Amino acid sequence: MQAAKTSHVRSVAAPLIMYGTAWKEDRTQALVLEAIAAGFRAFDTANQRKHYVEEEVGAAVRAAIASGTVTREDLFLQTKFTYQHGQDYRLPYDPDCDLTTQVRQSIASSLEHLGVTRIDSYILHGPSKSSGLGQADWQTWKTQSMEVWLACSELVTSLSTSSIPSSVVCG
């Protein structure tokens, strides 16, 4: 199976389909290896232990590379930053830090989990609160998202958002 790709923001070739790794728990590594054997080359995960076992995705990636099945360049790895309200008690960052520091800490943890030196796509997964957002909240988010991008641009090829209206991101 040849991975189909389409152009994406900032000339990053993004796959049309990714293998999602949520809710696989102790089967994550085996299922990711099966997906690689079946031809998948793009994987979506998150540094959100509540739903993902990012370390097992990394173990599968390392095993597939070590066996010669794929190279790092063959793979497209996408992971996410999830705000505290979407996490359980196993936070990959210090919740008392500012957003930029939280994202840096989460990226560092993801890089370690995945065993790679860069992430192809990094998603800021939703607004910081689940409800009751006003215009001031959106303005703060827009300002912080640029700070976050500047802080992580050397480790991340593409930064995206999820669950945020395009009118907020595009102005």
Predicted regions and their residues:
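Active-site beta-loop-alpha junctions enriched in small/polar residues
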Residues: 22-24, 48, 80-84, 124-127, ...
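N-terminal binding-site loop/beta-alpha segment at the start of enzyme catalytic domains
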Residues: 1-79, 117
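Glycine/proline-rich, positively charged
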Residues: 91-171
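Short amphipathic alpha-helical "recognition" segments used for binding
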Residues: 38, 82-84, 146
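Short catalytic/ligand-binding loop motif for oxyanion handling, primarily in non-cytosolic enzymes
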Residues: 27, 52-53, 85-87, 129-132, ...
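Structural motif corresponding to the early beta-alpha repeats
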Residues: 68, 73-100, 125
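Hydrophobic positions in alpha-helices of CheY-like receiver
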Residues: 61, 81, 141-144
